[in-house]
């Protein structure tokens, strides 16, 4: 009897560790699978052309990314340098504009995978807890915006290795330089990424305000903010865009952004699962999570097959706000867990230890089931989006290569996007439809597809004219149509 207790305790602790390890492996595996799927889906279905991506891709093809738009958003230089500029250089060297667009899509959608690889390499925490949270964040947040080429995708990808480097880079000149480069890259991904930069420095505060790593990060932050302000002053946006950017900034944190079908579905799934689990845990405590998950899968199946008529498309743009708001929360939890495991906290954090112990003892399986339910929602909604995008792109191609015409739009070679079936127009992005129509027609459209109610115009007449007259790899026909369109409005 004297040995039974310790042996039983050992088996119990082993079981707890095993369940926690399974949850960890599930999160890591799912995050990595998503990061690979982003690249595969984007390239197979040409998602680099969706929404603003059509304009960015066209700018790459005609080798004018900076002149077309990026000089207006100088605070997002990281995206320009890491994806658009290399693609534009490739077009210049290869003479193949279509291949250049593929290079842009590849580099942009590789960011989540590259971010996870960088985080794994930089993370020195016990159990690589920062890397685990990075995978969790990638799996739960990135599918919300996947497909829309928001610069916050890159910001999210850079945040995690930047967090790991800030906590674990050696206090040497080389280590400080690495922290500076990572925080600078993050800050110049998007204006919203400044929130993530501040968050990283804040996660170091629990080490103590006199801790060398905190002081290093704070000093680097001051330098990064100074550089960001200097660039904004030196390279201001055009007058046309200044007002547009100001209005966009004012609505960035509007709570109405989250009142969309995908967010409601995710919260309803969690709430439904949680409620069913609590009820069944009294009847079958060991398998309540399985039964609750099975019931929710059945409910979701009924919803998707018979009740659902939504497409998570345009809201992918607005949900970039979720990355700004939720990513720092995941980052803070990761940093606290890492510092607790390394015993680097300046003060005891008993509630954190108790929460982690509770997760290991009782919540690993229920959390795993909840995680997979959310993943199921993301998988289905992503599949619906990709399928609808494929049909919409085909419809635009038909118009761009056809003979239908709407001269009232300003030219006999213009055709209205309203000719597209209404159920497909949910994938439309009115300001970039003309650029999409040129690309899908292999840069030689017989018609320029235009949204007649569009009120946002990317190019001025002068910019479009200069590009048309320049020597470019793209045939002049498509560039001429866009020049006419631009000169009619700007």
Where is each model-derived feature located?
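Structural signal for the C-terminal ends of transmembrane alpha-helices
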Residues: 44, 119-126, 161-171, 202-212, ...
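Start-transfer (signal-anchor) and selected internal transmembrane alpha helices
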Residues: 1-38, 341, 347-348, 353-367
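Hydrophobic/aromatic-rich transmembrane helices and adjacent perimembrane loops
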Residues: 265-269, 311-350
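Transmembrane-helix motifs of polytopic, lipid-linked glycan transferases
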Residues: 106-131
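Membrane-embedded, lumen/periplasm-facing catalytic core of multi-pass transferases
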Residues: 370-489
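Signature aromatic-anchored transmembrane alpha helix within multi-pass, membrane-resident enzymes
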Residues: 222, 285-298, 339-379
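Short hydrophobic alpha-helices at membrane interfaces in multi-pass membrane enzymes
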Residues: 128-136, 155-185, 215-219
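Transmembrane catalytic cores of multi-pass membrane glycosyltransferases
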Residues: 37-112, 142-152, 184-321, 385-395
């Amino acid at each position: 009897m004297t040995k039974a207790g310790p042996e039983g305790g050992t088996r119990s602790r082993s079981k707890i560790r095993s369940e926690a390890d399974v949850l960890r492996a599930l999160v890591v595996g799912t995050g990595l699978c998503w990061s690979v799927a982003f690249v595969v889906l984007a390239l197979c279905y040409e998602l680099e052309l969706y929404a603003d991506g059509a304009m960015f891709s066209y700018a790459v093809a005609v080798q004018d990314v900076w002149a077309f738009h990026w000089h207006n958003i100088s605070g997002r230089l990281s995206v320009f340098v890491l994806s658009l500029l290399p693609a534009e250089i490739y077009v210049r060297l290869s003479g193949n504009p279509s291949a250049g667009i593929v290079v842009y899509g590849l580099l942009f959608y590789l960011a989540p995978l590259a971010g996870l690889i960088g985080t794994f390499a930089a993370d020195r925490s016990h159990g690589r807890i920062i890397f685990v949270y990075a995978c969790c964040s990638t799996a739960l947040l990135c599918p919300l915006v996947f497909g829309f080429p928001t610069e916050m995708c890159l910001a999210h990808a850079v945040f995690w290795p930047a967090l790991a480097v800030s906590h674990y880079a050696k206090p040497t000149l080389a280590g400080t330089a690495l922290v500076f480069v990572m925080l600078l890259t993050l800050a110049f991904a998007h204006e919203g990424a400044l929130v993530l930069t501040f968050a990283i420095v804040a996660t170091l505060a629990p080490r103590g305000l006199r801790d060398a790593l905190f002081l290093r990060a704070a000093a680097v932050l001051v330098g990064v903010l100074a550089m960001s302000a200097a660039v904004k002053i030196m390279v201001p946006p055009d007058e046309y865009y200044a007002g547009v950017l100001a209005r966009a900034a004012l609505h960035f944190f509007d709570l109405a952004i989250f009142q969309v079908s995908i967010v409601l579905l995710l919260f309803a799934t969690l709430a439904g699962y949680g409620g069913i689990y609590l009820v069944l845990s009294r009847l079958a405590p060991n398998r309540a999570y399985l039964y609750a998950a099975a019931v929710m899968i059945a409910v979701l199946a009924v919803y998707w097959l018979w009740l659902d008529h939504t497409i998570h498309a345009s809201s992918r743009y607005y949900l970039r706000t979720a990355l700004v708001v939720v990513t720092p929360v995941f980052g803070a939890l990761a940093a606290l867990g890492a510092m607790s495991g390394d015993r680097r906290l300046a003060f005891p954090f008993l509630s954190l230890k108790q929460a982690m112990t509770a997760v290991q003892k009782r919540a690993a399986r229920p959390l795993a089931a909840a995680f997979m339910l959310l993943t199921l929602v993301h998988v289905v909604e992503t599949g619906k989006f990709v399928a609808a995008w494929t049909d919409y792109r085909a419809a635009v191609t038909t118009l761009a290569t056809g003979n239908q015409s709407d001269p009232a739009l300003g030219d006999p070679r213009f055709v209205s996007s309203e000719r597209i079936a209404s159920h497909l127009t949910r994938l439309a992005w009115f300001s970039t439809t003309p650029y999409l129509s040129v690309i899908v027609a292999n840069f030689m459209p017989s018609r320029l597809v235009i949204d007649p109610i569009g009120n946002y115009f990317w190019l001025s007449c002068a910019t479009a004219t200069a590009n048309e007259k320049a020597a470019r790899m793209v045939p002049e026909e498509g560039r001429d149509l866009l020049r006419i369109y631009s000169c009619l409005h700007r």
